[in-house]
């Protein structure tokens, strides 16, 4: 199972800068970016979980 470079970058960004990871993954500023920014202001761990879900587990 090969991991692509973009996935590695998204994983690192999802941990340290969750809104940026969502922005890069979605290629636009959508509702998920706004939700994640709000989560970052209030709770950092849920923002990381949301970014990981959006980048890797969303169908």
Curated annotation (Swiss-Prot):
Compartment(s) of residence: Membrane
Membrane topology annotation: Multi-pass membrane protein
Annotated keywords: Membrane, Transmembrane, Transmembrane helix
Primary residence: membrane
KW Transmembrane helix (keyword) present: yes
GO CC annotation terms, alphabetical: membrane
Domain of life: Eukaryota
TM region positions: 5-25, 37-57
Similarity remark: Belongs to the UPF0057 (PMP3) family.
Protein name (record): UPF0057 membrane protein F47B7.1
Gene that specifies this protein: pmpl-1
